[in-house]
Amino acid sequence: MAAQALAAQAVASRLQRQEEDIRWLCAEVQRLRDEQLRGPERGQAEGPRLTREVAQLQAENRDLHQRLCGLRLRLAEQRRTEAGRAAAHEPPTQNQEKDTKKKRLKQSEPGREVKQPNFIKERLQLFETLKTDHQLLPATQEKKNTNNVISVRVAGGKTVQGERWKTTPYQVAAGISKELAEHTVIAKVNGVLWDLDRPLEGDSTVELLMFDNEEAQAVYWHSSAHILGEAMELYYGGHLCYGPPIENGFYYDMFIEDRVVSSTELSALENICKTIIKEKQPFERLEVSKDTLLEMFKYNKFKCRILKEKVDTPTTTVYRCGPLIDLCKGPHVRHTGKIKAIKIFKNSSTYWEGNPEMETLQRIYGISFPDSKMMKDWEKFQEEAKSRDHRKIGKEQELFFFHDLSPGSCFFLPRGAFIYNALMDFIREEYHKRNFTEVLSPNMYNSKLWETSGHWQHYSNNMFTFDVEKDTFALKPMNCPGHCLMFAHRPRSWREMPVRFADFGVLHRNELSGTLSGLTRVRRFQQDDAHIFCMVEQIEEEIKGCLHFLQSVYSTFGFSFQLNLSTRPEHFLGEIEIWDEAERQLQNSLVEFGKPWKINPGDGAFYGPKIDIKIKDAIGRYHQCATIQLDFQLPIRFNLTYVSKDGDDKNRPVIIHRAILGSVERMIAILSENYGGKWPLWLSPRQVMVIPVGPACENYALQVSKECFEEGFMADVDLDDSCTLNKKIRNAQLAQYNFILVVGEKEKINNAVNVRTRDNKIHGEISIASVIEKLKNLKKSRTLNAEEDF
């Protein structure tokens, strides 16, 4: 043991000397780079050589760190073993026996935290060793010819001086205002998200992001996920997997052997999270070699998989808060106390990376905010959303249902089918105005089609496949490959471009059973899918047409929307000149369209840039439904060509993938919740209710209902003798009939009806012919407020 201690001391001493050399060399490289900006001759001559020296020393240091950690771990293990042997020969004291009994009693109590797993202690020991012996950033030590003064410009504000490797964004913020520093969630340094307590490394532009910023929210919820992860480790003792921020909150997945999470345990987890928050545990960042992290997380096969499969660099980062140390790129808030309000509200089961053949994981969801008022507003919002839940409305209004014998495939009842068909009729009318041609394509294809399109290699697990006469077939999950066959079935000329194919074909996707959720996530659905085959020079005009199309549809529904242009990603296919031209035309289309839009650099698909559209519903939620996506790759894969003006028959078209509703099922869910079940007349599954004042008028009521039905309205008659007239009217209003037509002897004589609305606005006696004519005009115009416009 003494020999190992001496070896560890020698390695540590050598490591310290080399780290001093690295600090000096790093500072020298930075100085030379700064000089290069002012006078490039010297910086160009010496910079590369010194950079290579730094890299060589750092590589050697990584090896030394691993040796040092190994030596110290073995040394610590030997000490624990010897201490254990010594303790085994000592009889327990009376107090120790009492403590042991108390611990056992505590662990046996239901709802109490389990004993802290052994791996937590071992993980912490290694982290502390690494933290002591391997500081992430060079210390600020004065060296010959080293200038540590840096310029820090606060975005939109003043410029201050700082010290390299020492000044932090938090100090910069505090220098402006303590209140500003306390309310800042995260910093952005030279365009990169940065921990507030992480020292700056050179001249910097610093942005200070508050919670109202989307990136800051993601960081805030990511830090909250770490708090939840710490609580889950303490409570369940399982192995953590992924814990990301999501659109509204966060979750953490955990593998727990032989048990599942119960919703009754969520309040206990929430209390542990609140304790962690009170402790104000700092978030500590450390960059560590991949090999050392494999040793640190050897107890957790999921973290080891991430390291082996996802990390392609020699080092990566971990973050610590309290006893939790987690693989994480960060950044994070300063400490757990920054989370002022937290709620753990839901749990479910899932699979490792969504693969049903892999391990089952327990997923727990949470939400957090920087003040309690925001939490109360969120809870109020959840109650409102719950009352508008499309599954609740679908059941109450008898629109649709699901059955275990066909999970993920909706059964639309007559009134739900009316809404479905009304939406498709609306889009068909728009197709006719905009020169789209509707086509019908097969539901199943040989797998060779999907191999050609590239979907088989990347998407086959999400397809329903089966064997037919020794060949593999699949139900189509999208229409585009079939439309490529339709375009290619005969020669095409520039004269017929653009070709616009529209298809309401049935699509199937093999979604995991645990992800199915009402109409928003299904296995069987239809889209208002269209593919435009056009020449490159036609892109701008076609995109403008798509934008006006979606504006027309969304304004009819009463939706506002956001536009985002996603441009060329780092890894893309195709010629850069074509990408540049396509992006230029997309930008021109957006500018001419005249609505606000943002750019998402590098967020396009690998096969083409796109415009993402999010609609905003009545309670402020955003939903992505429409898609406008350019595709340069499918025309190549299917060898699509057209004959140009000069007779060249090898010209490639560009494909524009375009959907407005997206999935019709999902749009019905969104519309149900947006309207809260109060459908506008043209979409309403209950448009007219006819109510006779007594038995003598029932035949006339049936006649009025028949006339309405023959004109295309969803009309019903209430002939229930057990209800009073007022009760019948109230029932019709609660059932959301847009118009209630009351008929008595007077109306019967005058061939009229007495009109009132579901909001009890009384329009009085009107002839049945006039009522039907007005209703037809209101339905045709697709007005949102037919009851007011009547």
Swiss-Prot record:
| GO CC annotations, alphabetized | cytoplasm; nucleus
Q: What reaction gets catalysed by this protein?
A: tRNA(Thr) + L-threonine + ATP = L-threonyl-tRNA(Thr) + AMP + diphosphate + H(+)
> Kind of enzyme, top EC level?
ligase
Q: Coiled-coil segments, which residues?
A: 13-68
Q: Where is the TGS domain?
A: 148-210
Annotated keywords: Acetylation, Aminoacyl-tRNA synthetase, ATP-binding, Coiled coil, Cytoplasm, Ligase, Nucleotide-binding, Nucleus, Phosphoprotein, Protein biosynthesis
Per the record, the similarity remark reads: Belongs to the class-II aminoacyl-tRNA synthetase family.
Note the NCBIfam families from the entry. Answer: thrS
Job of this protein:
Catalyzes the attachment of threonine to tRNA(Thr) in a two-step reaction: threonine is first activated by ATP to form Thr-AMP and then transferred to the acceptor end of tRNA(Thr). Also edits incorrectly charged tRNA(Thr) via its editing domain, at the post-transfer stage.
Q: What is this protein called?
A: Threonine--tRNA ligase 2, cytoplasmic
Q: Which gene encodes it?
A: Tars3
